């Protein structure tokens, strides 16, 4: 099975891209969730949006990332079906901080997209929160980077 970061690495051009910075391609409409929110809230969000990463905050400061993959790993495949297990219902009552990725890699908006690509590939991650003076200003994903390399 090919991961998203492997796919990005396999499709990158051999020549450096035009000089774009993270701010040029990042998504600025970011959805956050609190560390102590329950996973049931994350489920409601993921069920109604097309993106796969929630930035986790504590007192408006980035604390982690909850990916859709992290969320699904915490649940059994029976969630939402007639065979839903008591364990699944209990799992949805867990707090976000119990499942999230702590201390995520981040990047600044002025950084070159090649730096972002290197971080994502080197650490096999799907996204980077974009921080400016410790304030969340956006998010950049491997799909954003792939589009930047090939969209003219």
Model-derived features: where do they sit?
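Tandem CBS (Cystathionine beta-synthase) repeat/Bateman regulatory domains
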Residues: 1-152
């Amino acid at each position: 099975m090919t991961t998203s970061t492997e796919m990005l690495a396999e499709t990158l051009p051999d020549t450096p891209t035009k000089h774009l910075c993270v701010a040029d391609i990042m998504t600025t409409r970011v959805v956050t969730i609190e560390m102590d929110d329950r996973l049931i809230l994350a489920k409601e969000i993921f069920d109604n949006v097309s993106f796969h990463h929630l930035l986790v905050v504590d007192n408006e400061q980035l604390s982690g990332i909850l990916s859709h993959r992290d969320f699904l790993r915490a649940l059994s495949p029976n969630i939402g079906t007639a065979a839903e297990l008591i364990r699944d219902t209990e799992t949805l009552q867990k707090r976000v901080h119990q499942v999230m990725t702590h201390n995520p890699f981040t990047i600044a908006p002025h950084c070159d997209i090649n730096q972002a690509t290197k971080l994502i590939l080197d650490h096999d991650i799907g996204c980077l929160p974009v921080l400016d003076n410790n304030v969340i200003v956006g998010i950049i994903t491997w799909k954003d980077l792939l589009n930047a390399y090939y969209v003219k």
